[in-house]
Amino acid sequence: MVSLLDFNGNMSQVTGETTLLYKEIARNVEKTKKIKIIDFGIGQPDLPTFKRIRDAAKEALDQGFTFYTSAFGIDELREKIAQYLNTRYGTDVKKEEVIVTPGAKPALFLVFILYINPSDEVILPDPSFYSYAEVVKLLGGKPIYANLKWSREEGFSIDVDDLQSKISKRTKMIVFNNPHNPTGTLFSPNDVKKIVDISRDNKIILLSDEIYDNFVYEGKMRSTLEDSDWRDFLIYVNGFSKTFSMTGWRLGYIVAKREIIQKMGILAANVYTAPTSFVQKAAVKAFDTFDEVNQMVSLFKKRRDVMYDELTKVKGVEVSKPNGAFYMFPNVSKILKTSGFDVKSLAIKLIEEKGVVTIPGEVFPLNIGKEFLRLSFAVNEEVIKEGIQKIREFAEQMMNSR
């Protein structure tokens, strides 16, 4: 007899999207305590999708572009993606080396399905975006964590010695994310070169997630695609959600050599058939909206500066100014030590008492995040100031509690 609850055995290791847990707590607090909620947990731009993109989607719908496309995506969009990457990074991507997916998460899922066998090891940064590890575990693989180094002065950087020490005969893949979620780090060109060299020299697949590549405030964004022999080791993932404020539209893409993309197409056809047709047409137009993108990034830089300045005034908090993405990752170890809370309990207490949503760093496994909170500055400046003032009051209360 088979039960409907007789799930794949690997599901026992997989957790839900745990950032949503804190949003649910906030909803309950708002309902029961009538407290105003300030949400620093959100991982998406707060601006509406740019008008020209919306108009292109409407036009595609009006023209009846509502049927299945190729599993690889429409040629017009694949060509646009290749042209954009080649112009920006001086690389040589061909249209046939691009597959369009219904979001960057499905892109990551396709990559992991294609490569990960039971007992394969995948090296992830600690901390890192939680979905990487969950999908690896679902497929029977084993996440192995390589620590990032942190100092208040320098922020986060690659710990090459720790990374190399984690490589074994079972290592199948290294996952790299730049700019980085949850820390907001834009890794230096030298750090990117180190990752590329380690992958190439050890003949390990490099999966590079560069979804935040346009959210750069200082420094140079070096893409892994800039390496001349990228086809020998690289699987590149990106998408439209962050750059063009299209999170709900669900569109991403993978770049890899042609033989790999052909295999991806077989998987895609069996998993979801094809990306949404009219959304692809809208995405073609997205490449004409970089004036709007640049305005958004300038706005986010101002917000970052406001949040950083306000956080430096908070007792018990140490924070580095991030150069990329739209996250701040302050160290709250002094507050934890004084209050006796762990970081998850602290985040919940902050919601319950002040209505401020942050994401505890422990959500971004494994160990480094246990002393950090993630805050998004994808909200307006007044909300940032109000929210950080509440955190300041809360921190003083916690620091004086013992």
Swiss-Prot record:
Keywords: Aminotransferase, Cytoplasm, Methylation, Pyridoxal phosphate, Transferase. GO terms for molecular function: L-aspartate:2-oxoglutarate aminotransferase activity; pyridoxal phosphate binding; transaminase activity. Optimum temperature is above 95 degrees Celsius. Transmembrane segments: none annotated. It comes from the Archaea. One of its GO terms (cellular component) is cytoplasm. It catalyses: L-aspartate + 2-oxoglutarate = oxaloacetate + L-glutamate. Its EC number is 2.6.1.1. L-aspartate binds at residues 43, 181, 374. One of its GO terms (biological process) is amino acid metabolic process. PROSITE patterns: AA_TRANSFER_CLASS_1. The keyword Glycoprotein does not apply. Its cofactor is pyridoxal 5'-phosphate. Its main location: cytoplasm. The modification N6-methyllysine is found at residues 203, 385. It is found in: Cytoplasm. CDD domains: AAT_like. The modification N6-(pyridoxal phosphate)lysine is found at residue 242. Homodimer. Belongs to the class-I pyridoxal-phosphate-dependent aminotransferase family. This is Aspartate aminotransferase. The gene is aspC.
